[in-house]
Design a protein with these regions (language model features):
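Catalytic binding pocket for nucleotide-activated donors in carbohydrate/polymer assembly enzymes
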Residues: 2-11, 92-95, 121-203
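Conserved catalytic-core segment of nucleotide-activated headgroup transferases in glycan assembly
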Residues: 3-90
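Donor nucleotide-activated moiety binding/catalytic core segment of transferases
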Residues: 12-14, 72-127, 131-132, 142-143
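Short, surface-exposed amphipathic charged segments that create phosphate/polyanion-binding patches used
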Residues: 20-30, 112-120, 178-182
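Hydrophobic beta-strand segments of well-ordered beta-sheets in folded domains
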Residues: 26-31, 71-76, 98, 116, ...
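Hydrophobic transmembrane helix bundles of membrane-integrated enzymes that assemble
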Residues: 30-33, 67, 118, 138-139, ...
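Soluble or luminal CAZymes and related metallo-dependent hydrolases
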Residues: 51-59, 170, 205-209
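C-terminal alpha-helical cap of glycosyltransferases
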Residues: 200-224
Length: 224
């Protein structure tokens, strides 16, 4: 990012690898959710305080927009820190048929049983799913999760191939459209090309990580 001269890409530091799962053969649909403190204490691009209730409503709208058959296959992973929002209670009051994970289980156990991974907030969650080659759909309200100008072209490309959505309805429709042939979508050339471009910019693992870090540190030290 030319507007961030002090930030230098070196690669993805948290190394994750594919689980060796043929996701097309799995039956689960995994929705990974987030929560935030009830009171604002810092300013960043994301839901603040009671905006989380709008975020939760988007999650409910996503589920309601899915066909009944997919709702029955869905597991919702709640954020491990509840912040007194009573996530589990709210979900159970809205949906009696949805499986909930309280965020305590190793997420890889859920991923291994899932055909598709749905990320709902802008953090490392989808970067890791990309590098693990898990079929992934992302959606969030762009008024809550704003991205910097330099990143917009990359997300526009994700949107073009059906990975990124700005409404829960659009995401749910796409999930239902590709569900029966995930590989036909996820392994298609347009999707692979966009993913490779995005990963090379934001979550590159095919690089000399330690060498890149050393080179950047030496370059900085030589300035003094």
């Amino acid at each position: 990012d030319p507007d961030q001269p002090k930030v230098h890409p070196v690669g993805q530091i948290k190394m994750v690898k594919p689980l060796g799962v043929d996701h097309q053969k799995e039956t689960g649909l995994l929705l990974v959710t987030n929560a935030n403190p009830r009171y604002s204490f810092q300013i960043f691009s994301g839901t603040q305080s009671s905006q989380w209730l709008d975020y939760l409503d988007d999650q409910f709208q996503f589920v309601e927009s899915l066909p009944k058959g997919l709702q029955d296959l869905l597991t919702v992973r709640l954020y491990f820190h509840d912040y007194a929002w009573e996530q589990e209670k709210r979900w159970n009051e809205r949906f009696s048929n949805i499986a909930l994970d309280l965020g305590k289980k190793n997420i890889n156990e859920l991923i291994a049983k899932s055909r598709l991974y749905v990320a709902t907030y802008n953090a490392g969650t989808y970067l890791q799913s990309f590098t693990m080659n898990i079929p992934t759909v992302i959606f969030w309200n762009s008024k809550h999760w704003e991205i910097r100008d330099a990143a917009i072209p990359y997300f526009d490309e994700l949107k073009r191939v059906g990975i990124f959505h700005e409404t829960p309805e659009s995401a749910a429709f796409h999930v239902s459209e590709v569900w029966d042939d995930i590989d036909g979508w996820w392994k298609s050339k347009p999707v692979r090309d966009v993913l490779e471009q995005f990963k090379s910019q934001y979550c590159d693992i095919d690089c000399d990580l330690t060498g890149n870090i050393e080179a950047e540190l030496r370059a900085e030290s030589n300035k003094f």
